[in-house]
Amino acid sequence: FNERIVASLKEKGLDYYSFYTYDTGLLSKHPITDSLTVFPENGDHGSIYRLTSSVNGHKVAVYTSHLDYLDCAYYNVRGYDGSSWKEIPIPTTVEEVLKVNVASQRDDAIKMFIAQAQKDIANGYSVIIGGDFNEPSHLDWIEANKNLYDHNGLVIPWTVTTLLEQNGFVDTYRHIYPNPLTHPGFTYPADNPL
């Protein structure tokens, strides 16, 4: 897929670079100096890939993630099993939600990203991660909105974004729009009719 995009852009006179990835992709306007599979796709439990490049003499490491879609506990909070999508009783405690959430491999993948990213930072790279975490941000599930957006009274320290924040990463959306009441950040399926 990535090769076709690069070839199509080339036909239009645009030079872009990419490398093989299984279920996500990275395109770069700048030549790629290295690429790496950080968390390999295995049994449809997500993946993380990394490229390094130089932008105006500055070293950057860019990661793409498509984390495990199973055990998506934000569905559980809304009365649906996060793996089968069948109706279930709505959990009433944060502990119930997080027990389901950590059954996924999202936390394993993000820990592998953090370990690699720390090496990149130590080697002078600026690090950027994007993609589909298949999990909300803990910065969007706070006391002020616990009774909005089907949060059902819960304030949840979602695992992936909590780990990222604890390791010095910044949620850029929340940095630009710090108020989740005026600028809510939603996670929902791409095929949602809204």
PLM features: what roles do these ranges have?
Residues N2-D81:
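Structured beta-strand-rich core segments of catalytic domains in phosphoester-bond hydrolases
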Residues I32, L67-L70, F133-P136, Y177-N179:
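Short, solvent-exposed loop/turn segments at secondary-structure junctions
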Residues Y75-A103, A144-N147, H151:
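A solvent-exposed, charged loop/short amphipathic helix patch at secondary-structure junctions
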Residues G13-D15, K59, G124-S126, G168-F169:
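A generic structural signal for alpha->beta connector loops
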Residues A7, E11, A115, T162-Q166:
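Charged/polar, solvent-exposed surface patches and flexible loops
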Residues E41-S54, K111-I121, Y125-V127, V155, ...:
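Generic detector of contiguous secondary-structure segments
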Residues F1-E3, V62-S65, K99-A144, T172:
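Active-site beta-strand/loop signature of hydrolases that rely on acidic residues for catalysis
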Residues D15-S28, D108, K119, S137-L194:
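Active site of divalent-metal-dependent phosphoester/diester hydrolases
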